[in-house]
C-alpha cells in the first residue's frame, strides 16, 4: 500500500530496498534551509540489523500488508514447532528460530501469533504475559522487608527472574515476556 512518508508510524512494516523493515522510531525534521524530511530508525525483519533512512516528507513509501493469525502451540520436535489453527484445526509447522529467545516460554495450548507476508511466515510471537510456577527461590529473612527488594528465583522452564521477597516456591507468577521480568503473583 503506497502512502506518504509523513504518515510513517512506529510499529509499521515497510517494503524498502527489496526487504521488509519494521519502523522502530521516527523523527520529523524541518531544517532552516531545504525541505522537511523524516528520519526513520528501522530494523530489517530478516536479519535484525538496524538501519537509518531519510525520506523527504512528500516521498512515497510502500507499507507491507501483513497477515496475522493466532495459532495454538501443540509440540516441538527438534527444531520444528507444530501449531494448530483454533477454528479450522489446520496444522502448520514453523522453525523454532522464528521465536528467538522467547522459545523458552512455550507451553501446551499457548496462543502463538504468526505473521505472514505474501503467504510466507516471517515471524512468530508468544503472548506478552505468561503464567509460570516458581521452582526454586531463597527463603525470606525477617527484617529484610523495610525496602522493596527482590530475590532471584528459578522458574519451571529453567529461567531466572528476580521476584519480590513474598514469593515462595510453588507460587505461580505472571512473567512479562518482552522484558523477561516478574509482573505479578497469580491470585488464587
Swiss-Prot record:
Coarse class of the protein's main subcellular location: cytoplasm
SMART domains: EFP, Elong-fact-P_C
Gene Ontology CC terms, in alphabetical order: cytoplasm
Gene3D superfamilies: 2.30.30.30, Nucleic acid-binding proteins
InterPro entries: Elong-fact-P_C (IPR015365), NA-bd_OB-fold (IPR012340), Rib_uL2_dom2 (IPR014722), Transl_elong_fac_P/YeiP (IPR020599), Transl_elong_KOW-like (IPR013185), Transl_elong_P/YeiP_cen (IPR001059), Transl_elongation_fac_P (IPR011768), Translation_prot_SH3-like_sf (IPR008991)
A single GO BP: peptide biosynthetic process
CDD domains, per the entry: S1_EF-P_repeat_2
Pathway of action: Protein biosynthesis; polypeptide chain elongation
Keywords: Cytoplasm, Elongation factor, Protein biosynthesis
Residue stretches spanning the membrane: none
Cell compartments where the protein resides: Cytoplasm
GO molecular function: translation elongation factor activity
Free-text function comment from the UniProt entry: Involved in peptide bond synthesis. Stimulates efficient translation and peptide-bond synthesis on native or reconstituted 70S ribosomes in vitro. Probably functions indirectly by altering the affinity of the ribosome for aminoacyl-tRNA, thus increasing their reactivity as acceptors for peptidyl transferase.
Stated family: Belongs to the elongation factor P family.
Name of the protein described by the UniProt record: Elongation factor P
Amino acid at each position: 500500500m503506497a502512502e506518504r512518508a509523513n504518515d510513517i508510524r512506529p510499529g509499521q512494516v515497510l517494503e524498502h530496498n527489496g526487504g521488509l523493515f519494521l519502523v522502530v522510531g521516527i523523527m520529523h525534521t524541518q531544517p532552516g534551509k531545504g525541505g522537511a524530511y523524516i528520519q526513520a530508525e528501522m530494523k530489517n525483519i530478516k536479519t535484525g540489523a538496524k538501519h537509518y533512512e531519510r525520506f523527504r516528507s512528500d516521498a512515497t513509501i510502500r507499507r507491507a500488508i501483513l497477515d496475522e493469525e493466532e495459532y495454538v502451540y501443540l509440540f516441538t520436535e527438534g527444531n520444528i514447532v507444530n501449531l494448530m489453527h483454533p477454528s479450522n484445526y489446520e496444522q502448520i509447522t514453523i522453525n523454532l528460530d522464528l521465536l528467538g529467545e522467547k522459545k523458552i516460554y512455550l507451553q501446551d495450548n499457548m496462543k502463538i501469533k504468526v505473521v505472514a507476508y505474501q503467504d510466507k511466515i516471517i515471524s512468530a510471537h508468544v503472548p506478552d504475559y505468561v503464567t509460570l510456577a516458581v521452582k526454586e527461590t531463597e527463603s525470606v529473612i525477617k527484617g529484610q522487608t523495610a525496602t522493596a527488594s527482590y530475590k532471584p528465583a528459578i522458574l519451571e522452564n529453567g529461567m531466572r527472574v528476580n521476584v519480590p521477597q513474598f514469593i515462595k516456591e510453588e507460587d505461580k507468577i505472571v512473567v512479562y515476556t518482552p522484558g523477561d521480568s516478574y509482573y505479578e503473583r497469580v491470585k488464587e
